[in-house]
């Protein structure tokens, strides 16, 4: 099975993806993680991507699609795509790549729907472990080490540090989502991401189970 999960910034894509791959034994392809790894390499490409991300702009489709294509070449079997596609052009690209590689397409699409004000509050309060990608709330997590992997490398993500960039990312998401909904309308599962992590996971599991019967 091939599942993709998308939603606005702060909707919990990474958190829910981690829970899903643990439960269903999927492999994970996270576009966000791929980009952050390149940024941390401090290569010429990484510096260019960092500047784009800090300004709240989206990475060019050709860069994203090339990264994804390289990653998919390493994966067999069931997998989950976190944060891709982000627009209709990327959706068409994904269909073409999957059909060419394995004569398949995406089976299920999970859309996490989140109110803008909640998204902004979450992003302003988000703290990320750079090593295991665990996410914490700055206002409630007072430790200096990650509870999961004990790393001390806890930081705000560069794309969460600027309110103008946050608002721009949210606006950009809304400008693209209708095209994706229409493209995947027969495979789309809509989830209320305003709820707690556990409640969101329960809703996703329930809807996935119905589609597996």
UniProtKB/Swiss-Prot annotation:
GO cellular component: cytoplasm
GO molecular function terms listed in the Swiss-Prot or TrEMBL record: adenylate kinase activity; ATP binding; zinc ion binding
Sites where the protein binds ATP: 10-15, 126, 135-136, 195
Enzyme category, top tier: transferase
Pathway where this protein functions: Purine metabolism; AMP biosynthesis via salvage pathway; AMP from ADP: step 1/1
Region annotation NMP: where it falls in the sequence: 30-59
Catalytic function, reaction form: AMP + ATP = 2 ADP
Positions bound to AMP: 36, 57-59, 83-86, 90, 157, 169
One Pfam entry name: ADK
Cited SUPFAM superfamilies: P-loop containing nucleoside triphosphate hydrolases (SSF52540)
Keywords tagged on the record: ATP-binding, Cytoplasm, Kinase, Metal-binding, Nucleotide biosynthesis, Nucleotide-binding, Transferase, Zinc
Domain of life: Bacteria
Positions with a binding annotation for Zn(2+): 129, 132, 146, 149
EC id: 2.7.4.3
GO biological process: AMP salvage
Cited PANTHER family: NUCLEOTIDE KINASE
Task performed by this protein: Catalyzes the reversible transfer of the terminal phosphate group between ATP and AMP. Plays an important role in cellular energy homeostasis and in adenine nucleotide metabolism.
Family: Belongs to the adenylate kinase family.
Name listed for the protein in its UniProt record: Adenylate kinase
Lineage, broadest ranks: Bacteria, Pseudomonadati, Pseudomonadota, Alphaproteobacteria, Rickettsiales
Protein encoded by which gene: adk
């Amino acid at each position: 099975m091939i599942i993709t999960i998308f939603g606005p910034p702060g909707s919990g894509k990474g958190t829910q993806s981690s829970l899903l791959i643990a439960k269903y034994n999927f492999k994970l392809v996270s576009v966000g993680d791929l980009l952050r790894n390149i940024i941390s390499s401090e290569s010429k490409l990484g510096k260019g991507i960092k500047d784009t991300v800090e300004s709240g702009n989206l990475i060019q489709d050709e860069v994203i699609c090339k990264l994804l294509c390289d990653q998919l070449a390493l994966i067999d079997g069931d997998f989950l795509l976190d944060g891709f596609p982000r627009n209709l052009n990327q959706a068409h690209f994904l269909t073409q790549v999957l059909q060419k590689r394995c004569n398949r397409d995406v089976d299920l699409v999970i859309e996490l729907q989140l109110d803008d004000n909640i998204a902004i509050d979450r992003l302003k309060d988000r703290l990320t472990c750079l090593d295991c990608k665990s996410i914490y709330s700055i206002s409630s997590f007072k430790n200096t080490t990650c509870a999961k992997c004990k790393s001390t490398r806890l930081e705000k993500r560069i794309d969460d540090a600027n309110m103008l960039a946050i608002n721009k990312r949210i606006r950009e998401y809304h400008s693209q989502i209708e095209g994706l909904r229409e493209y995947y309308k027969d495979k789309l599962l809509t989830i209320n991401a305003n709820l707690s992590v556990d409640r969101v996971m329960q809703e996703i599991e329930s809807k996935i189970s119905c589609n597996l019967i």
